[in-house]
Amino acid sequence: MDFILPELGEGIEEATVSFWMCEKGDKINKNDDVIEMLTDKATFNVPAPVSGVLKDILVKEGDIVKVGQKIAEIE
């Protein structure tokens, strides 16, 4: 399943990856925080949309990601 960056708040179109709270191959549970994102207004923890294994991480720390962009794959 594609893990996309969800809406973070009104008017926020992109955010910077602060850090991943898990690694490729880790088992994750739905609603567990897995990535921290930074904007000019706030810091957001983004939860996993589903339970599974983090198959691939597509963005790294420091990358700027747009809302709706695929950031990882969950299997």
Question: Where are the predicted features?
Answer:
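Acidic, low-complexity mobile loops and tails
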Residues: M1-M37, N45-S51, K55-L58
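Flexible, nucleotide-binding loop/lid elements of kinase catalytic cores
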Residues: A42-F44, K70
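C-terminal structural segments of small proteins and small subunits
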Residues: I57-I74
